[in-house]
Amino acid sequence: MEANKGKFYHETGGESLKPNALFVGYKPMFMSSNHYLQRLKRRFGVKKAGYSGTLDPFAKGVLVVAFGHYTRLFDHLNQEPKVYRATLWLGLHSDSLDIENILGVEVIPPYSKERVEEIMGALEGEISYTPPKYCAKRIGGRRAYDMARNKEEVELPILTMRVGRLSLLHYTHPFVHFEAEVSKGSYIRSLGGMIASRLGCYGALSSLERLSEGEMRFEGYRELEPLEILPYPKIDATSLKEEFLHGKKLLASDLGNPKEGKYIAEFEEFFSIIEIKEGQVVYLLNRMEKC
């Protein structure tokens, strides 16, 4: 894939990533996203690292990871749509809508494949939903999952997700295997619960895998080139290198009066992300070292 040019790094190899690095990792099942990040930090000997888009502990799959200053790039990456593959267990009653907090299993008669497809088709588009109470969202400064574990009342706001595609892969009762293409921040556990609810039964996910975020997929531990995957056009600012280097105030006219929007200014040793707004040049990220 074009976006994944760069040096190849095996997770188990002895090579080290650069101090500033951006790459796609693959989190195993039954490990928190933070635990996985700490493991990568130890393996590659880095102190500063971060990830974008938490995966549930029971889920596996793509996790975008950055080391060093490149953690500042997360807000500028195009991570939509997110594509997931999941298995929904019909009749499984779980507080967390997965296999981690099972309350019981109900044996239910099978549905027709056509009925399942009809329900899934009706969920495509923009839908409102309530996140699972076992989630990382904060309520009054506390994590919802901590409150749920303490048997406290958890009241989460209604959210909106955009479901671009919801496809039935196969249905072997009581397991519904599906693939979903959704907007950033969506909860696939909630989507699975909605499918089951509309069928008239309990349901929870027995497996969940994130396949991609935008154009980013796991293809081995390869370093991504930021200038190839950032979604902004480049602007010629070669003659203003010193001004960019020191973050000096600039006007849009200094850059030829481009239309309002976000741009990348590339120089030999570094690049900057700027925004042209109301005739001004706003530095969003300045002096990001190139690797």
Swiss-Prot record:
One MF annotation (Gene Ontology) recorded for this entry: RNA binding
Major enzyme class: isomerase
Alphabetical list of NCBIfam families matching this protein: TruB
UniProt keyword list: Isomerase, tRNA processing
Active-site residues from the entry: D56 (nucleophile)
Matching InterPro entries: PsdUridine_synth_cat_dom_sf, PsdUridine_synth_N, tRNA_psdUridine_synth_TruB
Function of the molecule: Responsible for synthesis of pseudouridine from uracil-55 in the psi GC loop of transfer RNAs.
E.C. code: 5.4.99.25
Family note: Belongs to the pseudouridine synthase TruB family. Type 1 subfamily.
Catalysis performed (reactions): uridine(55) in tRNA = pseudouridine(55) in tRNA
Name recorded for this polypeptide: tRNA pseudouridine synthase B
Signal peptide region: none
GO biological process: mRNA pseudouridine synthesis; tRNA pseudouridine synthesis
Protein source organism: Wolinella succinogenes (strain ATCC 29543 / DSM 1740 / CCUG 13145 / JCM 31913 / LMG 7466 / NCTC 11488 / FDC 602W)
tRNA processing in keyword set: yes
